[in-house]
A protein has these predicted regions:
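A charged helix-plus-loop insertion that forms the helical arch/lid used to bind
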Residues: 68-93
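Beta-strand-turn-beta hairpins that frame and shape the catalytic cleft
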Residues: 9-20, 172-175
Length: 175
């Protein structure tokens, strides 16, 4: 039991241990299919090692667009090489829900782990149609998607790719 004083009140709580795995690996940029294969393999490996919450990095599916900061002409309007790379990134971005989220949900339920993973999200219809978002998904160990957060304000060169998110995903979820 742990006792803490918060706001003049004494609170007692039971401390639980949680084994967390943080995956430090490279996706297969910008190939979502192969990056998902890599993610699923690491999730299964971490679960077998006893992890109960497995975290993969920002935009792991299909990978972070580091070219933004290194590609000559990345900010030029209507620049053909950049348009080509952006089109490939857009094509490999994920629709939520979709087959990729289905695969993540299935593995979470099968190996009984929580999964936190960053994705490039593509909006196909409705509000935000045509936009890409830097999103974070949290799957509970029963496979349910319990939080879907879009990065509020992409920074610097990220603004050339991602739209501003909203506060809908700023909430806590029980593990």
């Amino acid at each position: 039991m742990v006792e803490t004083e918060i706001g003049g009140r004494l609170r007692t709580s039971r401390r639980k241990e949680l084994a967390v795995a943080v995956v430090q690996a490279s996706p297969v940029y910008p190939n979502t299919t192969e990056s998902l294969r890599v993610a699923l393999a690491f999730i299964e490996e971490a679960a077998a090692a006893g992890a109960k919450l497995i975290c993969l990095g920002e935009t792991f599916l299909p990978g972070y667009p580091a070219w933004l900061d290194y590609c000559e002409g990345a900010a030029l309007w209507n620049h053909p090489p950049v348009k080509e790379v952006f089109a490939e990134l857009r094509a490999n971005s994920i629709v939520v829900p979709g087959s990729e989220t289905g695969a993540l949900s299935e593995v979470a339920a099968r190996v009984h782990v929580g999964i936190v993973i960053g994705i490039h999200e593509r909006i196909e219809d409705g509000p935000g149609h045509g936009s890409l978002y830097n999103s974070l998904l949290f799957f509970r160990e029963d496979g349910s998607l319990v939080n879907h957060h879009r990065k509020l304000i992409p920074t610097y060169s990220e603004r050339m790719i991602w739209a501003n998110g909203d506060a809908a995903g700023l909430r806590c979820a029980k593990i």
